[in-house]
Amino acid sequence: ATLIAKFHICFEEGGVKKGDKIALCAKNSAKWGISFLAINTYEAIVVPILADFTPESVNSLVDHSESVILFTNADMWKKLDIKAMPRVHTVISVDDFSLLYTSHENVRTAMKNLQAAFEKKYPLGFTRENVNYPTDNDKELAIINYTSGTTSAPKGVMLRYECLSANVEFGQEHIPSHPGDKIVSMLPMAHMRQMQVAHYAKCSFVRHAD
């Protein structure tokens, strides 16, 4: 939650508004999940892109989705062409959350002085009371998920928050899991099924310690 709050500061400095698109193209990791939730809880629209797509496809989908920020791995970033993604003003590494690129000096300054900005925003400290995410946005667009393009060019599927919550509720009811259970999945987290089963559904079980 602390990292998510810090990313929200960066989004604010970058002029990101509710409903703006932010692309996420990276290998499976805990930081993928943190990046996703940072975007999602800011009420920006997440654009997950499969990390095994060609650099040309990633360039094309980031541009097609009208994304303004890109989260990706450093090795993928080396293969991308920022000129092919003209709306993107900031690129953040999912490897270590460092800044890979920005055309906004205020974003660069915010990233450099992020801890100070965080402490200024939360002068009494960051507590569970500060973790307050939207719950009244079921009908609003949450994700643009591009298909793998097995039989044709990838298509962007537009999903509302209620689509995600309905799948989570179904999974909890019909495929229950418990603390200590192990889940084996070979799908990338940008794949809708992996995102629902191993990411969203598991996050819904998080509880604060008493």
How does the language model describe each region?
Residues 22, 39, 70, 141, ...:
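Conserved S/T- and glycine-rich ATP-binding loop of Class I adenylate-forming
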Residues 51-82, 167-184:
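Conserved ATP-dependent adenylate/AMP-binding module captured primarily in the ANL superfamily
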Residues 109-146, 153, 176-182:
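Conserved pre-ATP/AMP-binding loop-to-beta segment of ANL
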